[in-house]
A protein has these predicted regions:
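Alpha/beta-hydrolase active-site loop
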Residues: 2-28
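Gly/Ala-rich beta-loop-alpha elbow adjacent to hydrolase catalytic centers
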Residues: 36-42
């Protein structure tokens, strides 16, 4: 059970991420946004996905967890669950409770596309998955560009080398 202080911190982080989305990302011309959450910041990003219309801008949602529970997209939004499944990567350490004890297995697509990593130490997980993350982001952006081109949309700007996105937590 979470303490009042932990709940207050979680809610404050969620509010900051929503504020950044509403006042920076949503009003920017950017069309290829990548959300990257690490540790406890993952909850705030999944909260954002469930509470704002992010699908037109966000090409990838990447979570790098420790042993904390995997945040879930809302159960009652089938179209969002499908989108999240297609656009997410959730990297978990080797001994994450999902794999060690089968926790959350019944949550299905609401978990995103989870990947059990060989790395056992959460603090070493991010450097271990950087190459896979970069390949996933590149594939997602290329797919979005191909879809836009097929639909007759004007080409978008060329991406800079994978630079940090505006909305990271």
């Amino acid at each position: 059970m979470q303490t009042e202080e932990a709940n207050a911190q979680r809610n404050a982080l969620r509010a900051r991420v929503l504020y950044l989305w509403d006042n920076v990302v949503a009003v920017s011309p950017a069309r290829h946004v990548v959300l990257l959450g690490h540790g406890t910041g993952c909850d705030a990003l999944v909260h954002l996905v469930g509470h704002r219309a992010v699908r037109d801008k966000v090409r990838a949602a990447i979570l790098v967890l420790a042993t904390n529970p995997i945040p879930l997209v809302p159960k009652n939004r089938q179209e969002l669950r499908q989108w999240y499944w297609e656009h997410s990567r959730v990297y978990c350490p080797h001994d994450h409770p999902l794999y060690a004890f089968g926790e959350q297995k019944t949550s299905g697509k609401r978990l995103g596309r989870t990947q059990q990593c060989q790395e056992r130490h959460p603090e070493a997980l991010l450097p271990a998955v950087l190459g896979d993350m970069a390949a996933f982001i590149e594939a997602q952006v290329k797919g979005a560009r191909a879809a836009a081109s097929a639909n007759g949309a004007a080409p978008t700007e060329k991406p800079a080398a994978l630079e940090p996105a505006a909305a990271t937590a």
